[in-house]
Amino acid sequence: MRRPLDAERIRRFMRELGEEAERDVRLYFTGGATAVLVGWRPGTVDVDIKLEPETDRLFRALPRIKDKLEMNVELASPDQFIPELSGWRDRSVFIGREGRLSFYHYDLYAQA
């Protein structure tokens, strides 16, 4: 069992994955990662993400980064479980940018 992820390890994941992006990509965090980065709780068991657009290079980098940082990463977002809400991209909150990878909290309204 891997240890819970705190904000620093999630930010390290952001830096590591950002180094791999060869073009502009958006990554949306959902669930536990959002709760940790916003400060609602100290840790999470995994990081749920959505990439737009999906790129082979980032998908290939994920297993290596997951192992290096000893973390679980799931490709999951609310639009896989409920109908996509109109305007969700506009409501997604910008976190920061690492290289060519921009990080957002997936629309909190859709996560509720």
Protein language model annotation of sequence segments:
Residues M1-A112:
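Compositionally biased terminal segments of proteins
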